[in-house]
Amino acid sequence: MPSKTGVGYITVSGFVVTKAATTWAPPAAYQDGMIGPHWSKGWIIEDCEISNSKCAGISLGKYYDPENDHYFTNKYVKSPTQMERDAVCRGQYHGWLKEKVGSHIIRRNNIHHCEQGGIIGRMGGVFSIIEDNHIHHINNMMELGGAEIAGIKMHAAIDVIMRRNHIHHCTMGIWCDWEAQGTRLSQNLLHDNQRPAFAKQLKGGMMCQDIFVEVGHGPTLIDNNILLSDASLRFATQGVAMVHNLICGALTCVGEGTSWRYTPYHMPHRTEVMGFMTILHGDDRFYNNIFVQKWPSEDFITMHDSDDGFDSENRKVGTWMFDEYPTYDEWISQFDFTKPADMKKLESVHFDHLPVWSEGNVYLNGAKAWKHEKNGFVSSENVKVELTEKDGKYFLDTNIYEILEAFSGRMINTEVLGKAFEPEEFFENPDGTPITFDTDYFGGHRGAKVIPGPFAEKEDVGKNVNICTAF
């Protein structure tokens, strides 16, 4: 990493970087890594093998700010959340602009056996592309707990695209914390991102899942992914759209995990802060996904390492966790636009759950649908979904498409998804152009018959699903 900030447009290609004593890299401190642009713009890190970092492999993270560095550790008179809000605003003072920071490309790297994260970064990774990386065996030694551990852990992943990555055997797969605005996770293969059953949870550690989106306002787009771990998405957030995914794990932490925290949202496709708000939950969309109860449906219990406590988490797959959330019609009916606004009367509405949309989803093997699901498909037939590996290639062994037969959904696009509530930003490309979900997991074209899940054709199930091109 450069010793100073602002050293931009560097290419790091074809290196082997291993065994470095990097330091713990939380979001409100200087974020160290074995490789990183150190608060600059336009780096390319490609075709590298990055391994055995004591903490982070690649850091796209925060610069050193002496007045805010490790504030809570050293002073703790402000809450950790407040110091992070301070860090966002101070970052704008210190040049956190699209023209100066971010827009990196991280591609085709083999990142493994790092103990905090494969790729981490607070604010410095905005507008970046993270693609075709093989990220695996992160935090397997379990020497470190704390809320910063994942294959990819990004704060403020504004307009960041993470696509075609193969992430497995990590304590957590991808963690988008705060300001996952314009973030898109697409065509990724995630599996085995869970601790062994005997492993206890370290002090400060988190539960395991393929994806965690935390205290954001959206729009966060998760499409055409294969999610095979026992927990697919930890949902302590709002403004998420899940489209054309194969989801074999539970949606956890729905309506929970945010407390009173209020976090920033931004001008569309910019870093400038537009506002702050608590997480109301909801404002979520589910279209053309396949939900499979692959794992046991009983709540999962994780014992603590540092005390006699434990954590319990849902493992029942499906959208049923949103049963208490309103449809759009139910939500909008609370506002009478023919009368003058009554601030006091609307107070409870303004702080209640936002609406949810769910259509064209498939629920198999006991997975349960939201009570307002439209055009859904539910089957009690026995379903198998197994991932097998041979010579570096990965294949799905499944009978899903035999059960689906002729069922189909409609073509989904930006117009269908609409805008995320707080930032009033469409689910769209970083350049503001609309998205039509007519391209599948393999890059193939979806035709007039739209099959739920990540594949355009049922015959695609026999293809190698490891489309990551890392060596």
Regions found by a protein language model. Give the residues of each.
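Active-site-adjacent substrate/metal-binding segments within catalytic domains
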Residues: 11-26
